């Protein structure tokens, strides 16, 4: 799996933006990716030092359109803590 396939997109929420000020970034990642793979991908793609990673599996929600019921896909979220004083400049403009 390519490093660019592991990182899907940054999480866009108020809580994620508040974490950016403390050097904590949140990303949606491939559900099959492991913590060492995620760490290597973040370090190589953004050129930063990752100090810690927390991951969580987010189950898909039940959605309904009229009488038809379906489910959103299950996702995996990674919360990445960077070394002191480091930032991901590509995401700083979004906050």
From Swiss-Prot:
It holds the Pfam family Ribosomal_L23. Transmembrane segments: none annotated. Gene3D superfamilies: 3.30.70.330. GO terms for cellular component: ribonucleoprotein complex; ribosome. One of its GO terms (molecular function) is rRNA binding. Keywords: Ribonucleoprotein, Ribosomal protein, RNA-binding, rRNA-binding. Coiled coil: none annotated. GO terms for biological process: translation. Belongs to the universal ribosomal protein uL23 family. HAMAP family: Ribosomal_uL23_B (MF_01369_B). Part of the 50S ribosomal subunit. Contacts protein L29, and trigger factor when it is bound to the ribosome. One of the early assembly proteins it binds 23S rRNA. One of the proteins that surrounds the polypeptide exit tunnel on the outside of the ribosome. Forms the main docking site for trigger factor binding to the ribosome. This is Large ribosomal subunit protein uL23. It comes from Deinococcus geothermalis (strain DSM 11300 / CIP 105573 / AG-3a). The gene is rplW.
